[in-house]
Amino acid sequence: MGQTRVAATTAAQSPAAELSPETNGQTEEPLQLLGEDSWEEFSIAVPWGTVEAKWWGSKERQPIIALHGWQDNCGSFDRLCPLLPADTSILAIDLPGHGKSSHYPMGMQYFIFWDGICLIRRIVRKYNWKNVTLLGHSLGGALTFMYAASFPTEVEKLINIDIAGPTVRGTQRMAEGTGRALDKFLDYETLPESKQPCYSYDEMIKLVLDAYDGSVDEPSVRVLMNRGMRHNPSKNGYLFARDLRLKVSLLGMFTAEQTLAYARQIRCRVLNIRGIPGMKFETPQVYADVIATLRENAAKVVYVEVPGTHHLHLVTPDRVAPHIIRFLKEA
């Protein structure tokens, strides 16, 4: 256990060329890819409504379960999935309260980490899937990490993008912020739609572009907002599709000790793709500590640093796809 390959990909060494590698002096057949149109909308009934998704590839095979980041949606994978092999299936999910999925009923809070683990389990049990492969970005990667730790014998491969484990907060910060978070949650819960800000399409795109602070470019924002906003006919403008209550994220955060305890439970093969510079973490050392802990316990760990923003799989998917393809092909 603990076998590791560490690779640093530079802009001058573009991984896109690895899609058609040469082996033993002979050029392999070009890899057949999924392409942009190989998906269908997919709906999963849950007790509070539906979880909506995009199913990429054939429904005749068990899919990779893909989970997006906080306040994003499954459109986050719209540029990556087309670059994956045609014999791959991916179920990219809109997490509850995101994209086209149902919001939680009034009176309920989003405990995003614990809710997400339960959602994955609900789906796996519903379809009786075995030896699952999980793909996650940011929050989605924290959820897949937690699931792999909670069900260590039932996950075959774990692929995470620019996240090592759940977001870590200092205990003092969590204690000091709890009251404000609860009041903020209740304010959002009681805010009527008539008082929610409404924007023109162009205003919405600019607002989101500015909010992501360089992590995405304008074409990427347009991809995300295909599922991230909804039209309001009465105001002739657009509202965010996501549940406003999701903006309260402090509740349910982890300490470093908790995250490392879960890391020690993971036994599957792991690919971790970290963007450089990627996301700015409050506790950057924890990322390295999680990877080190995984190396001690997981069947195999591949840690790769790739030039890009936190949303590198969306903005520069050609840099990310070759690493995933290679990892999926490995026995």
From Swiss-Prot:
GO terms for biological process: digestion; response to toxic substance. Ubiquitously expressed before embryonic stage 11. At stage 11, expression is concentrated in the foregut and posterior midgut. By stage 15, in gastric caeca, pharynx, posterior spiracles and anterior edge of midgut. At the end of embryogenesis, expression is confined to gastric caeca. During third instar larvae, expressed at low levels in gastric caeca, midgut and hindgut and high level in fat body. Transmembrane segments: none annotated. It comes from the Eukaryota. Keywords: Detoxification, Developmental protein, Digestion, Hydrolase, Serine esterase. Residues 7-17 have a biased composition (Low complexity). It is an enzyme of class 3 (hydrolase). Residues 63-163 form the AB hydrolase-1 domain. Its EC number is 3.1.-.-. The active site is at 138. GO terms for molecular function: carboxylic ester hydrolase activity; hydrolase activity; serine hydrolase activity. May have a role in detoxification and digestion during embryogenesis and larval development. Belongs to the AB hydrolase superfamily. This is Probable serine hydrolase. It comes from Drosophila melanogaster.
